[in-house]
Amino acid sequence: MANIAKQLTDLIGNTPVVELGKFSALKGLKKPLLAKVEYFNPGGSVKDRIALAMIEDAEQRGVLAPGATIIEPTSGNTGVGLALVSAVKGYKLILTMPDTMSIERRNLVKAYGAEVRLTPGKDGMKGAIAEAEKLKAEIPGSVILQQFENKANPARHYATTGPELWKQLDGKVDVFVAGVGTGGTVSGVGKYLKEQNPDVRIVAVEPLSSPVLNGGQSGPHKIQGIGAGFVPQTYNAEVIDEVVDVANDDAILAGREVGRQEGLLVGISAGAALHAAVEVAKRPENADKNIVVLLPDTGERYLSTVLYAFDDYPL
């Protein structure tokens, strides 16, 4: 029987898990860390999952008509995922983002057919959100999917990412580590894993200089993709056992090291999750545990950032 996907969105999910033997040895760990590699999604990141989920949810609720306009304030991977899914499904997509975002980011979503509206960089994401709301008021039948509030976000991780992981490891998951942007991944996967085994420990990761999940003040940081500066509605603290705060340089170093050791080119938030996973794995009680870390995206989106500025930012 032919094994042919009907459309690209059918290839979202079912990402592989790989053992990080050399990286773990470099860090002096007794047992190798395991990584779920989300850049195997067609759009190159974990956000393909929620882009498809939020659009399908809007369709099922009847708020998104065929050919309608989707608007979303996003400067990152969610925009890429939405652009890919919108292209497949025939929706118009307008993404609002600060004008400080890289040319690569803008051109990447344009390549999928999305329209980009830039807002003043000094206004940050709040400016992009305000522009999205303005556009929604002007365009009949348009919708804003609101990834930081949309229940379809953690629900998709509960329905897919969590079960995939459980099956891939034959239920032998002791600790799960993931960064928190919207919190959808760690909350959805965490809920599923704890339903299978309440003893599984769920570790959330945020920037040290913006430790809001640990009750601290928001602040600037270099770890793109996590640390929104507020606690999202899509983050479920009830399934989280611990929040690890990671410094910028530790995230950058781990991201670089896993590329050199394992051939895994990842983004800076993956570096943060890796560093946190190493810290957890070094504890004596975790020496023989299966620790899984989720790597959200590819490093190709960060080649012009501090992550790969080897000459200007040596570590």
Model-derived regions, located:
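PLP-dependent amino-acid enzyme catalytic core
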Residues: 1-315
